[in-house]
């Protein structure tokens, strides 16, 4: 993209806004290097990255890249095997800390599988491949406190040396303290302090005593009144301290070398982390800019078609900017904009040009969703007064020089923008030149926008296929532009109307009208009529919008009324459902009692008659319950057609009393697949209810093939009973009740967990199972089932 267009359209100001949102120096570097792209796939990729980052910003908040250092030079030193300093290692630690922060922000894992919250997008892989290298980072942080300080615990050797240094220091201070407090030396001291000179402990001795005091002189004050002397009593200790300092430095260098070797093994991961963090910083800066500008992702096409919906120039104060709609490149490829000065013509040009540059650079544009941009290899712009004083060029010459260059280089893949084409010279010749230039560009099918004051160009646009007029609206009443762009309508000269409004006499205005040609006045009358028609159309449109709002309000009230009716219906159905639950509970209680009696009577023949009577009563009771519930359900349930079901609908599977979602459309027989949790089953539509249409009437009671009753899910029972810790007299009633419920729920087998212990509880359970008639058999658990701590019970 040519530099002149970038400068003219103020693209660099957008880049400055973008760079300010990057947190790291490398991120800002990438922002400053951003230029428009020309490959569709690259542009779409960058746009999607910006959108995905924006989605994450709204979902999780900001991700900080602030303070991430540039370690490129450090990595180059690692390449040649150099040992790093403490400061360099701390920079690497900062990068690794930022890497971990980014990893946690962008990629969540659970059980080694990506969670649903961490949705796949264009950024997921970047986050996933980041390597925080936590062991290395922790080791650096453990060993290095700051650029000037290594931790005592960095190595046993360093800890030992520093302990010896402390001991030696203490000895020196003890010895010097004795000297300071000695009566024989108090008079020799300039000050009663201990000082350091050339790395050795000294005392400040008065100049006249420097030869009397026993020791080695290392320095003297600037006035010569004080000599700094190392007492002979601590010379040996000072020597030891110097040796220990050398050993300390050797230990530190050893620690830094070991850390450098450790870091060098991961230099490629470090390089990837640095590069990826810079890219993410760059991407999230683009997302932040989109958020600040309230922008949206534009759609792109290869048809050179532009359709900007409510576009706002990003460099104009958001409180003052007026959104504009601009479209061209479909039915017409040349747009001629007319209107008053300061009316918004130039802003319209710059908006189209700047949006094109921003979009092709992967930036969102401040416009409504659904806006479209096209890809142009070059954008050429001749906007504003670019007169060159150095070259002594007039305004016209300057613009014409630029125009000549544009005509030489532009092709059908270019976007050309002219502001006041042909201005700065004789109006007749200027208009002729402007028409010739636009005609030339139009013949070559080059997408062009041009602003003008010339009426001849309005006529050119009206009479030429593929060319359209547009104007910036001006209010004669307020004498102010509205900044609205009206496509399809040429701009009308408002000079006479404005002059009259400002008080110019009618005589002068009428005299002026005589000086313009009848043809020109007729043309202005046509434009006036068009403007009047447009205003009338907008009035009709406003009335239609009002009618639409009234209809919507009526629809809303009707929906509220229907909602109240539905609520009443739902209440009635809930009451019916509760009644069904009551009937079902009564049937269950009756069945429980009957089974207990059956167990009590046992298999003896004397009680056969009583048992048979109870069976008959139970069958009658359950039959009544079943018929009652089924009839209520069928009466209240809507019969659905195959066309009523769509993939994703929430449904109630009546026979299973489970909720699920439709995963396929019904086949010719009315069968479709329903996903119920991890279960996917083929179900006929006659066995389904749409949950959002009708509240479930009753929990279905369906007969199984064996004739037993399968209870609803709400009355389902656990497949195991834990009685560990219970006494026999406490456990057996629980076992008895549990077996009854499990048998009624039609469980094929259950597990009783009694534990090993003394075996008394297991024996009591086994004895009880032998007396239970509907138990087919039992056994202790096998390997993996609980062994002798559980009993597996199988029902008849």
Swiss-Prot record:
Q: Which GO terms describe its biological process?
A: mismatch repair; negative regulation of DNA recombination; rescue of stalled ribosome
Listed A to Z, the keywords are: ATP-binding, DNA-binding, Endonuclease, Hydrolase, Nuclease, Nucleotide-binding, RNA-binding, rRNA-binding
Q: Which PROSITE patterns match?
A: DNA_MISMATCH_REPAIR_2 (PS00486), SMR (PS50828)
- Molecular function terms, GO-annotated: ATP binding; ATP hydrolysis activity; ATP-dependent DNA damage sensor activity; endonuclease activity; mismatched DNA binding; ribosomal large subunit binding; rRNA binding
Q: Which SMART domains match?
A: MUTSac, MUTSd, SMR
SUPFAM superfamilies recorded for this chain?
DNA repair protein MutS, domain III, P-loop containing nucleoside triphosphate hydrolases, SMR domain-like
Root EC class: hydrolase
Mind telling me which InterPro entries this protein's record contains?
A: DNA_mismatch_repair_MutS_C, DNA_mismatch_repair_MutS_core, DNA_mismatch_repair_MutS_sf, MSSS, MutS, MutS2, P-loop_NTPase, Smr_dom
Q: Name one Pfam family in it.
A: Smr
Residues bound to ATP: 339-346
Q: Where on the tree of life does the source sit, at the highest rank?
A: Bacteria
Bilayer-crossing regions: none
Where do the record's region annotations for Disordered lie? 620-644
**CDD domains per record:** ABC_MutS2
Residue ranges occupied by any Smr domain in the UniProt entry:
721-796
Q: Give the family this protein belongs to, as stated in its UniProt record.
A: Belongs to the DNA mismatch repair MutS family. MutS2 subfamily.
Q: What does this protein do?
A: Endonuclease that is involved in the suppression of homologous recombination and thus may have a key role in the control of bacterial genetic diversity.
Subunit note: Homodimer. Binds to stalled ribosomes, contacting rRNA.
Protein name, please? Endonuclease MutS2
Specify the species: Lachnoclostridium phytofermentans (strain ATCC 700394 / DSM 18823 / ISDg)
């Amino acid at each position: 993209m040519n530099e002149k267009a970038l400068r003219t359209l103020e693209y660099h100001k957008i880049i400055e806004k973008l760079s300010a949102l990057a947190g790291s120096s490398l991120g800002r570097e990438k922002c400053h290097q951003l230029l428009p792209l020309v490959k569709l796939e690259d542009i779409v990729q960058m746009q999607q990255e910006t959108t995905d980052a924006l989605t994450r910003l709204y979902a999780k908040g900001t991700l900080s890249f602030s303070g991430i250092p540039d370690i490129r030079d450090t990595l180059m030193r690692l390449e040649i095997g150099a040992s790093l300093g403490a400061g360099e290692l701390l920079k690497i630690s900062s990068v690794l800390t930022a890497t971990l922060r980014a990893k946690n922000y962008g990629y969540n894992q659970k059980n080694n599988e990506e969670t649903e919250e961490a949705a796949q997008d264009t950024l997921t892989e970047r986050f996933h491949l980041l390597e925080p290298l936590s062991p290395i980072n922790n080791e650096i942080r453990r060993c290095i406190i700051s650029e000037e300080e290594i931790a005592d615990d960095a190595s046993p050797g360093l800890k030992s040396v520093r302990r010896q240094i402390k001991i030696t220091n203490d000895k020196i201070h003890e010895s010097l303290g004795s000297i300071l407090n000695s009566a024989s030396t108090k008079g020799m001291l300039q000050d009663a302090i201990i000082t350091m000179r050339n790395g050795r402990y000294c005392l400040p001795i008065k100049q006249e005593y420097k030869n009397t005091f026993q020791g080695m002189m290392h320095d003297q004050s600037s006035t010569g009144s004080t000599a700094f002397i190392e007492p002979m009593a601590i010379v040996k200790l000072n020597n030891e301290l110097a040796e220990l300092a050398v050993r300390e430095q050797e230990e530190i260098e050893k620690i830094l070398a070991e850390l450098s070797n450790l870091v060098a093994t991961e230099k490629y991961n470090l390089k990837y982390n640095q590069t990826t963090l810079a890219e993410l910083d760059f991407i999230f800066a683009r997302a932040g800019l989109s958020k600040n500008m309230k922008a949206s992702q534009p759609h792109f096409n290869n048809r050179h078609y532009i359709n900007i919906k409510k576009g706002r120039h990003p460099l104009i104060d958001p409180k003052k900017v007026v959104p504009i709609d601009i479209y061209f490149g479909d039915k017409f490829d040349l747009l001629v904009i007319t209107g008053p000065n300061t009316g918004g013509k130039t802003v319209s040009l710059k908006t189209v040009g700047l949006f094109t540059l921003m979009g092709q650079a992967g930036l969102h544009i401040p416009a409504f969703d659904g806006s479209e941009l096209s890809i142009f290899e070059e954008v050429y712009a001749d906007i504003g007064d670019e007169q060159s004083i150095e070259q002594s060029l007039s305004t016209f010459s300057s613009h014409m020089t630029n125009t000549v260059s544009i005509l030489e280089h532009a092709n059908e893949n270019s976007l050309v923008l002219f502001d006041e084409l042909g201005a700065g010279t004789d109006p007749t010749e200027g208009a002729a030149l402007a028409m010739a230039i636009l005609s030339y560009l139009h013949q070559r099918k080059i997408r062009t926008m041009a602003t003008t004051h010339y009426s001849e160009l309005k006529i050119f646009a009206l009479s030429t296929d593929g060319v359209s007029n547009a104007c910036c609206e001006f209010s004669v009443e307020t004498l102010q532009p509205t900044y609205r762009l009206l496509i399809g309508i040429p701009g009308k000269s408002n000079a006479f109307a404005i002059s009259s409004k400002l008080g110019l006499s009618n005589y002068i205005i009428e005299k002026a009208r005589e000086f313009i040609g009848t043809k020109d006045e007729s043309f202005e009358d046509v434009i006036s009529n068009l403007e009047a028609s447009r205003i009338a159309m907008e009035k009709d449109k406003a009335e239609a919008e009002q009618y639409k709002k009234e209809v919507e309000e009526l629809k809303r009230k009707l929906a509220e009324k229907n909602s109240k009716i539905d609520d009443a219906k739902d209440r009635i159905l809930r009451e019916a459902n509760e009644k069904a639950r009551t009937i079902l509970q009564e049937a269950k209680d009756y069945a429980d009692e009957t089974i207990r009696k059956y167990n009590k009577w046992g298999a003896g023949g004397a009680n056969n008659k009583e048992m048979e009577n109870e069976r008959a009563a139970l069958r009658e009771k359950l039959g009544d319950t079943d018929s009652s519930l089924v009839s209520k359900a069928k009466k209240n349930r809507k019969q659905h057609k195959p066309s009523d079901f769509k993939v994703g609908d929430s449904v109630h599977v009546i026979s299973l009393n489970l909720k699920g979602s439709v995963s396929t459309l019904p086949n010719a027989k009315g069968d479709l697949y329903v996903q119920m949790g991890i279960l996917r089953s083929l179900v006929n539509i006659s066995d389904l209810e749409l949950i959002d249409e009708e509240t479930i009437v009753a929990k279905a009671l369906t007969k199984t093939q064996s004739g037993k009753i399968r209870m609803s899910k709400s009355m389902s029972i656990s497949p195991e009973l834990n009685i560990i810790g219970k006494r026999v007299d406490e456990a057996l009633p629980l076992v008895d009740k549990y077996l009854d419920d499990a048998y009624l729920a039609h469980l094929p087998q259950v597990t009783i967990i009694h534990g090993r212990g003394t075996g008394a509880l297991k024996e009591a359970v086994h004895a009880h199972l032998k007396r239970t008639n509907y138990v087919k058999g039992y056994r202790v658990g096998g390997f993996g089932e609980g062994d002798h701590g559980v009993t597996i019970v199988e029902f008849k």
